[in-house]
A protein has these predicted regions:
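Short loop/turn motifs at secondary-structure junctions
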Residues: 13, 45-46, 92, 160, ...
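Residue-level signal for inorganic ion chemistry
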Residues: 14, 29, 51-54, 187
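Active-site catalytic loop in hydrolytic enzyme cores
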Residues: 73-78, 104-185, 189-199
């Protein structure tokens, strides 16, 4: 794993995990993430930022099942924190970005969270709610979740960052807004459907 230089001369150890979740099974997929935390703990140099896909702990195509698997950002952060502490031998700080179905203010969203683990409590640095929901072809996301209403940069240990979820990145306005807000790093989570003859 090579350092990814950015932030004007700083570098960060970044890990990107391809993660194919068991559809609709938050607890099972959380357990698999614990195995991933243990693998990361054994790496040297150890990653400082772990990125997982959109809807990493439930799968993407849930349609009406979103309500059953949606969690609050606080619940997800606590679950990740407890799992991380139980899965590693030395709980050094680890920043994690992953997509999840979020329940917020009695509405459901396709969201991404940036959370710092390893301290006495998890630190939720930002939650981004997907703004551009696809409603074409095989996609009908707007029937099951609400649109997010803002996109902005936020502070991390590495500088200003921003989160986008899948189709948000197809619209140049989102990148322009976060760049104007000082983002030096944009983390995009996505779960495009598989294509081709592979299982």
């Amino acid at each position: 794993m090579n350092p990814s230089p950015y932030l004007y001369g700083m570098s960060i150890q970044l890990a990107i995990a391809q993660f194919s979740p068991k559809k609709g099974d938050y607890r099972f997929n959380l357990g698999r993430l614990g195995d991933l935390f243990a693998q990361i703990d054994a790496l040297e140099p150890r990653p400082q930022l772990l990125c997982l896909p959109e809807s990493a702990l439930t799968g993407y195509f849930l349609e009406g099942g979103v309500r059953e698997v949606a969690v609050t950002a606080g619940t997800l952060a606590r679950d990740l924190h407890e799992l991380y502490r139980a899965s590693v031998t030395s709980p050094r700080m680890l920043d994690v970005v992953l997509g999840f179905y979020e329940e917020w203010q009695n509405k459901l969203y396709n969201s991404a969270i940036y959370v710092t683990l390893g301290g006495s409590e998890p630190i939720v640095r930002h939650v981004h709610r997907k703004m551009f929901l696809p409603t074409y072809g095989m996609f009908d996301e707007e029937r099951f979740v609400e649109r997010g209403r803002e996109v902005r940069a936020f502070d991390t240990p590495w500088g200003r960052a921003a989160l986008l979820v899948c189709e948000d990145a197809w619209h140049s306005i989102t990148g322009a807004i976060v760049a104007l807000d000082g983002a030096q790093l944009i983390v995009l989570v996505a779960a495009p459907p598989a294509r081709g003859p592979w299982p």
